[in-house]
């Protein structure tokens, strides 16, 4: 039997031990599994308490079972669910009993979702939304992923595809029945009006695409500066834990340290880098090289210095990354800090602005709240709200850009031959099929479903 035709099973809940464990089976032998382990198939969608037994009659557990017959199930196949006590021993015994059933095997990662897709229960954009939901770290990411899973982009793409098919039908009718007297003379005009409208709608969706993609991926903020400027101390203060080793000796941090922050629902990866300076130490040189590399790729650089100086060099200043200069250690005595208030620096009338944007004490926390508020506002400006993201992946953007190009070409070809316009519409319709996962997507499926956990 082909693997796609076999019944699959897996633990679908969290890893044991737990209060309850859910083991799910999907496929033609799901009903057989219920009969062999529980004695009978219960009424559809009705929970039933039973004593599960293995093939030799040994009791496995006092469990609750459910039956979801095809096609009205999550995968479109027969599904059996076993809700058992969540010990490793119980789960292992149940998995072993299911393994003894003919044509049943353990599921691969994402295989339940793949079968749901292949049986038309979800489209590819919804499967991608489920993947994003599983991997969501913040509430804004969760809301965006849930909207995708519920068909936000898929419904829109299906609507566009239908409109394109309608426009194509008008063009094709004009070609096929050009000599018929009862066919209107200019069927292309309403078709071209529809094409122009669709192109504008897709362009508007693309215009907001960057925010959806960036919210999914999150922002990267690098803490950089000279050695012993307090970078690791600031990282620990923002992370609210001891993520990096702090030492009074310069050059303690040699490698990149990353921590994750949730700033009001915005995902931020915070990076602590090695102190940037000239050095003869080959290990420290590698740390400085890596620091410069991550600084160049970050969305924002927090450059820390103290009253001993340490301004960023021209390479860092001239980069495309946003740069905030921060004066740290204001709790220490020094002419630069006399009378200085922590937080964002406000320039008074007639006063020249200093090179730094914030004054803080990372060790005491002075001014850090203002810095966090500014970071949150920065993230909000770049990422927007979760409701803005219709396009959340580069795949979506590339396909829709190609569709816009085909529609624009169809408009320019108007008057040169309806056959040329019809061909561009066929390309655009095909692209909508790719977006929904109905054509030319085997390589995409293999990559996507491998990201899912086993049992999903």
From Swiss-Prot:
Broad EC category: hydrolase
Keyword Hydrolase part of the UniProt annotation: yes
Pfam families tied to this protein: MMR_HSR1 (PF01926), MnmE_helical (PF12631), TrmE_N (PF10396)
Binding site for GTP: 228-233, 247-253, 272-275
Acetylation recorded as keyword: no
Record InterPro entries: G_TrmE, GTP-bd, GTP-bd_TrmE_N, GTPase_MnmE, MnmE_dom2, MnmE_helical, P-loop_NTPase, Small_GTP-bd
Manner of cofactor binding, per the entry note: Binds 1 potassium ion per subunit.
Binding site for (6S)-5-formyl-5,6,7,8-tetrahydrofolate: 24, 81, 121, 456
UniProt keywords, alphabetically: Cytoplasm, GTP-binding, Hydrolase, Magnesium, Metal-binding, Nucleotide-binding, Potassium, tRNA processing
Subcellular location per the Swiss-Prot or TrEMBL entry: Cytoplasm
Cofactor(s) essential for the protein: K(+)
Record-annotated TrmE-type G domain positions: 218-380
Positions contributing to Mg(2+) binding: 232, 253
Enzyme Commission number(s) of this protein: 3.6.-.-
Assembly mode: Homodimer. Heterotetramer of two MnmE and two MnmG subunits.
HAMAP family referenced in this protein's UniProt entry, alphabetically: GTPase_MnmE
Function summary: Exhibits a very high intrinsic GTPase hydrolysis rate. Involved in the addition of a carboxymethylaminomethyl (cmnm) group at the wobble position (U34) of certain tRNAs, forming tRNA-cmnm(5)s(2)U34.
The family this protein is said to belong to: Belongs to the TRAFAC class TrmE-Era-EngA-EngB-Septin-like GTPase superfamily. TrmE GTPase family.
Name of the protein: tRNA modification GTPase MnmE
Organism this protein belongs to: Nitrobacter winogradskyi (strain ATCC 25391 / DSM 10237 / CIP 104748 / NCIMB 11846 / Nb-255)
């Amino acid at each position: 039997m082909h693997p796609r035709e076999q019944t699959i099973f897996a633990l679908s809940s969290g890893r044991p031990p737990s209060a309850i464990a859910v083991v799910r089976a999907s496929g033609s032998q799901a009903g057989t599994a219920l009969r062999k382990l529980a004695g009978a198939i219960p009424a559809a969608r009705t929970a039933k308490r039973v004593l599960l037994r293995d093939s030799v009659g040994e009791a496995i557990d006092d469990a609750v079972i459910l039956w979801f017959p095809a096609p009205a199930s999550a995968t479109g196949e027969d599904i059996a669910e076993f809700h058992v006590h969540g010990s490793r021993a119980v789960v292992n015994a149940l998995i072993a009993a299911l393994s003894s059933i003919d044509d049943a095997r353990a599921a691969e990662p994402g295989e339940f979702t793949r079968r749901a897709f292949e049986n038309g229960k979800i489209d590819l954009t919804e499967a991608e939304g489920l993947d994003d939901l599983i991997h969501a770290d913040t509430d804004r990411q969760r809301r965006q992923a849930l909207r995708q899973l519920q068909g936000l982009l898929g419904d829109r793409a299906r609507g566009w595809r239908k409109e394109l098919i309608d426009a194509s039908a008008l063009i094709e009718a004009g070609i096929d029945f050009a000599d018929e007297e009862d066919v209107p003379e200019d069927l292309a005009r309403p078709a071209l009006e529809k094409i122009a409208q669709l192109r504008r709608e897709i362009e508007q969706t693309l215009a907001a695409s960057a925010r959806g993609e960036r919210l999914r991926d999150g922002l990267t903020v690098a803490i950089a500066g000279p050695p012993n400027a307090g970078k690791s101390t600031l990282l620990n203060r923002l992370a609210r834990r001891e993520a990096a080793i702090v030492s009074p000796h310069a050059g303690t941090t040699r490698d990149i340290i990353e921590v994750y922050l949730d700033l009001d629902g915005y995902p931020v990866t915070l990076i602590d880098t090695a102190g940037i300076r000239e050095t003869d130490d080959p290990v420290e040189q590698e740390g400085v090289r890596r620091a410069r590399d991550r600084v160049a790729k970050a969305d924002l650089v927090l450059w820390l210095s103290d009253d001993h100086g340490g301004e960023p060099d021209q390479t860092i200043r001239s980069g495309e990354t946003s740069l905030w200069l921060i004066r740290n250690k204001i709790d220490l005595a020094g002419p630069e800090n006399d009378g200085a208030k922590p937080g964002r620096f406000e320039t008074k009338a007639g006063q020249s602005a200093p090179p730094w944007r914030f004054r803080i004490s990372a060790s005491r926390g002075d001014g850090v709240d203002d810095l966090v508020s500014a970071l949150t506002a920065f993230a909000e400006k770049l990422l927007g709200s979760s409701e803005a993201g219709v396009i959340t992946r580069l795949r979506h953007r590339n396909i829709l850009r190609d569709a816009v190009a085909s529609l624009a070409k169809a408009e320019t070809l108007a008057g040169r031959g309806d056959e040329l316009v019809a061909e561009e519409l066929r390309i655009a319709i095909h692209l909508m099929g790719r977006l929904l996962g109905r054509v030319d997507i085997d390589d995409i499926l293999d990559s996507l479903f491998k990201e899912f956990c086993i049992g999903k």
